[in-house]
Protein backbone atom coordinates (compact mmCIF):
# COMPACT_ATOMS: atom_id res chain seq x y z
CA UNK A 1 0.00 0.00 0.00
CA UNK A 2 2.90 2.39 0.63
CA UNK A 3 3.92 2.13 -3.01
CA UNK A 4 0.46 3.17 -4.14
CA UNK A 5 0.52 6.16 -1.80
CA UNK A 6 3.85 7.27 -3.27
CA UNK A 7 2.42 7.35 -6.79
CA UNK A 8 -0.59 9.42 -5.81
CA UNK A 9 -3.25 7.10 -4.48
CA UNK A 10 -5.06 7.47 -1.21
CA UNK A 11 -6.62 4.65 0.79
CA UNK A 12 -10.24 5.22 1.72
CA UNK A 13 -11.79 3.63 4.77
CA UNK A 14 -15.02 5.59 4.41
CA UNK A 15 -15.92 7.19 1.09
CA UNK A 16 -16.82 10.86 0.90
CA UNK A 17 -20.48 11.12 -0.07
CA UNK A 18 -20.16 14.51 -1.76
CA UNK A 19 -17.24 13.92 -4.09
CA UNK A 20 -16.25 10.78 -5.91
CA UNK A 21 -12.56 10.30 -5.19
CA UNK A 22 -10.36 9.47 -8.17
CA UNK A 23 -7.08 7.55 -7.84
CA UNK A 24 -8.11 5.86 -4.62
CA UNK A 25 -7.85 2.34 -3.25
CA UNK A 26 -10.90 0.68 -1.74
CA UNK A 27 -11.30 -2.51 0.24
CA UNK A 28 -14.16 -5.00 0.00
CA UNK A 29 -16.17 -3.05 2.57
CA UNK A 30 -15.75 0.49 1.21
CA UNK A 31 -15.97 0.28 -2.59
CA UNK A 32 -19.62 -0.56 -3.16
CA UNK A 33 -21.34 2.83 -2.57
CA UNK A 34 -18.81 4.70 -4.73
CA UNK A 35 -18.81 2.03 -7.45
CA UNK A 36 -22.60 1.93 -7.59
CA UNK A 37 -22.75 5.72 -7.78
CA UNK A 38 -20.37 5.59 -10.76
CA UNK A 39 -22.65 3.05 -12.46
CA UNK A 40 -25.71 5.22 -11.85
CA UNK A 41 -23.92 8.32 -13.19
CA UNK A 42 -22.78 6.66 -16.43
CA UNK A 43 -23.68 8.63 -19.54
CA UNK A 44 -22.29 6.55 -22.44
CA UNK A 45 -21.04 3.08 -21.61
CA UNK A 46 -20.31 0.57 -18.88
CA UNK A 47 -18.00 -2.41 -19.37
CA UNK A 48 -17.61 -4.92 -16.56
CA UNK A 49 -15.08 -7.76 -16.77
CA UNK A 50 -16.02 -10.32 -14.16
CA UNK A 51 -14.98 -13.96 -14.52
CA UNK A 52 -17.68 -15.13 -12.11
CA UNK A 53 -21.37 -14.31 -11.76
CA UNK A 54 -23.48 -14.32 -8.61
CA UNK A 55 -27.28 -14.10 -8.56
CA UNK A 56 -27.46 -11.21 -6.07
CA UNK A 57 -24.82 -9.11 -7.83
CA UNK A 58 -26.38 -9.71 -11.25
CA UNK A 59 -29.83 -8.70 -9.99
CA UNK A 60 -28.36 -5.59 -8.36
CA UNK A 61 -26.56 -4.59 -11.58
CA UNK A 62 -29.74 -4.99 -13.63
CA UNK A 63 -31.65 -2.75 -11.23
CA UNK A 64 -28.86 -0.16 -10.98
CA UNK A 65 -28.39 0.40 -14.71
CA UNK A 66 -31.98 0.25 -15.90
CA UNK A 67 -32.41 4.03 -15.91
CA UNK A 68 -29.06 4.58 -17.63
CA UNK A 69 -29.98 2.08 -20.33
CA UNK A 70 -33.22 3.96 -20.96
CA UNK A 71 -31.09 7.06 -21.52
CA UNK A 72 -28.93 5.21 -24.08
CA UNK A 73 -26.05 3.90 -21.95
CA UNK A 74 -24.65 0.67 -23.40
CA UNK A 75 -23.86 -1.95 -20.74
CA UNK A 76 -21.57 -4.88 -21.51
CA UNK A 77 -20.50 -7.73 -19.23
CA UNK A 78 -17.45 -9.75 -20.19
CA UNK A 79 -17.39 -13.09 -18.38
CA UNK A 80 -16.31 -16.69 -18.75
CA UNK A 81 -18.54 -18.93 -20.85
CA UNK A 82 -20.96 -20.98 -18.75
CA UNK A 83 -19.36 -24.16 -20.09
CA UNK A 84 -16.07 -23.27 -18.41
CA UNK A 85 -17.63 -23.76 -14.96
CA UNK A 86 -17.96 -26.98 -13.02
CA UNK A 87 -20.86 -29.06 -14.34
CA UNK A 88 -23.04 -28.13 -11.35
CA UNK A 89 -22.63 -24.40 -12.12
CA UNK A 90 -23.21 -24.50 -15.90
CA UNK A 91 -27.01 -24.16 -15.87
CA UNK A 92 -27.18 -21.53 -13.07
CA UNK A 93 -24.53 -19.49 -14.90
CA UNK A 94 -26.42 -19.77 -18.19
CA UNK A 95 -29.53 -18.53 -16.38
CA UNK A 96 -27.64 -15.49 -15.06
CA UNK A 97 -26.23 -14.73 -18.50
CA UNK A 98 -29.74 -15.03 -19.96
CA UNK A 99 -31.09 -12.65 -17.30
CA UNK A 100 -28.42 -10.10 -18.21
CA UNK A 101 -29.24 -10.40 -21.91
CA UNK A 102 -32.99 -10.15 -21.24
CA UNK A 103 -32.31 -6.90 -19.37
CA UNK A 104 -30.60 -5.44 -22.45
CA UNK A 105 -27.07 -6.00 -21.18
CA UNK A 106 -24.63 -7.38 -23.73
CA UNK A 107 -22.88 -10.54 -22.52
CA UNK A 108 -19.52 -11.33 -24.09
CA UNK A 109 -18.14 -14.76 -23.18
CA UNK A 110 -14.37 -14.73 -22.94
CA UNK A 111 -12.59 -17.99 -22.14
CA UNK A 112 -9.79 -17.80 -19.59
CA UNK A 113 -10.88 -14.39 -18.32
CA UNK A 114 -9.09 -13.69 -15.05
CA UNK A 115 -9.05 -9.90 -14.82
CA UNK A 116 -11.53 -7.93 -12.75
CA UNK A 117 -12.40 -4.41 -13.82
CA UNK A 118 -15.07 -1.95 -14.83
CA UNK A 119 -14.72 0.92 -17.30
CA UNK A 120 -17.35 3.64 -17.12
CA UNK A 121 -17.70 6.19 -19.92
CA UNK A 122 -14.18 5.27 -21.11
CA UNK A 123 -12.84 7.42 -18.27
CA UNK A 124 -13.39 5.87 -14.84
CA UNK A 125 -11.64 2.55 -14.19
CA UNK A 126 -12.20 0.16 -11.31
CA UNK A 127 -9.41 -2.44 -11.26
CA UNK A 128 -8.33 -5.02 -8.72
CA UNK A 129 -8.97 -8.41 -7.19
CA UNK A 130 -12.69 -7.93 -6.52
CA UNK A 131 -14.92 -9.95 -8.81
CA UNK A 132 -17.48 -7.22 -9.48
CA UNK A 133 -20.36 -9.58 -10.30
CA UNK A 134 -19.57 -12.34 -7.85
CA UNK A 135 -18.84 -12.71 -4.16
CA UNK A 136 -16.51 -10.30 -2.40
CA UNK A 137 -13.66 -11.74 -0.36
CA UNK A 138 -12.43 -10.01 2.76
CA UNK A 139 -8.96 -9.35 1.36
CA UNK A 140 -10.18 -8.06 -2.03
CA UNK A 141 -9.29 -4.56 -3.13
CA UNK A 142 -9.96 -2.18 -5.99
CA UNK A 143 -8.33 0.94 -7.37
CA UNK A 144 -10.54 3.68 -8.77
CA UNK A 145 -8.63 5.51 -11.49
CA UNK A 146 -9.67 8.45 -13.63
CA UNK A 147 -7.72 7.86 -16.83
CA UNK A 148 -8.93 7.66 -20.40
CA UNK A 149 -5.62 6.05 -21.43
CA UNK A 150 -5.93 3.24 -18.87
CA UNK A 151 -9.61 2.77 -19.76
CA UNK A 152 -8.86 2.44 -23.47
CA UNK A 153 -5.96 0.06 -22.81
CA UNK A 154 -8.18 -2.26 -20.76
CA UNK A 155 -10.92 -2.17 -23.38
CA UNK A 156 -8.35 -2.98 -26.06
CA UNK A 157 -7.20 -6.01 -24.04
CA UNK A 158 -10.71 -7.47 -24.21
CA UNK A 159 -11.20 -6.55 -27.85
CA UNK A 160 -13.61 -3.64 -27.36
Named regions from a protein language model:
Residues 31-36, 113-114:
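Short, charged beta->alpha transition segments
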Residues 116-119, 143:
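Short beta-strand scaffold segments in enzyme catalytic cores
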Residues 28, 55-58, 107:
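A conditional alpha-helix N-cap/helix-loop micro-motif detector
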Residues 7-12, 17-24, 28-31, 124-160:
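Signature of lipid phosphatidyltransferase scaffolds
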Amino acid sequence: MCTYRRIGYEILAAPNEEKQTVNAIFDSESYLPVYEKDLMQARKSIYIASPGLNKNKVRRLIALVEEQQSAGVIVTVITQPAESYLQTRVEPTKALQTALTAAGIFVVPQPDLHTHFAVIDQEIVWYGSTNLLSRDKEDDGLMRIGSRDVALELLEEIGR
